[in-house]
């Protein structure tokens, strides 16, 4: 790019930023926050390497609700259980909008289920929840699919023969296969190139979007579209996944029997045919591709990441691991695999899984929200369309809700009688209207996978347990555990 083109680009960017800044002052009474600079906003106060820590630090100065400017974009930040709960639960309708998250929106254009709004989002969410809840229609249940995949995973883990290995890839393949089974109707062999492609592109995108490059792209997408860097791979990866999904949809169309749907794609295609004559229908081919992509992305990365954190925590605290195994032996034994019916009789195991999710805090800022109308909230007036960041890390680490929030402590989810105790501040799947629709599936996977693995193996670190580092490698879109290896000792 020559100097004239560069100058024109910078001038256009400056004008856009100025217009956005001026338009953000039109109405409303926003909470106080640091004074923004022209164009840059408050970026000089924020560490691009760790936006989460910077925003959390500002909440200690400005309180549980403050305004910050990410470049020209005005954002209201909510921290702590009470503020987040009042917004997402008590005033859930007003805070149910989804911001145009650039890394996704520039690909989906607001289509699909994760980043759509209004009637389209409500219709797609209701349809998807119904399909996931009633999946199978007389055929195999989701639990059966998880148990089947768990058996393949255990067989793969036995091949390690006690030698050190990195669990990332094997867990990703297995977890991804479950959502693939729901979406596409069947699992893939672990060496199937389609499965490997899905995992490769999703993992790469999750890491990029959790990096400084991803955070900068979120703030200045128009500028960074012209800048070389790893963020450019995001859309290449998305396109490859879209092409893979489109190929599967084409195969489904050729063999579709509306009376006997095999999977999510079949159900969606049938709905498309039913509403083909309705000009207001939200069921179109592009919507199918984007919704399938959203579910595939959401169902692959977060569960695998949580399981890796669980491995680290159980190796760092071997007494916790031993107590979980003792409960498994008592309730389930060794003659069969654990089942969902066992969970109610295993309060300590349930508490450990919840504590892993709280402590790991995989999606610490949730996905970005937006108010759907002018909203009176805590004495302020938030104008329609204002972006909202909910710091879920401050919910999961709120000392008013958890006795020792900075420590890994399963007792947070146990009462005085050692029975499982729910916490209203447990929000790894967010809360309110935008609660993750895959919550039930993810909870099933975490319980069935972790108990099956600990029934068969003990997790052994390569070094001293006290030296295991549980601090995340990235704190952007997601908290990622540091790379590690472990050994599995058959029990």
From Swiss-Prot:
It is a peripheral membrane protein. It comes from Gorilla gorilla gorilla (Western lowland gorilla). Disulfide bonds: none annotated. It is found in: Endoplasmic reticulum membrane; Microsome membrane. Its cofactor is heme. This is Cytochrome P450 2F5. It holds the Pfam family p450. Belongs to the cytochrome P450 family.
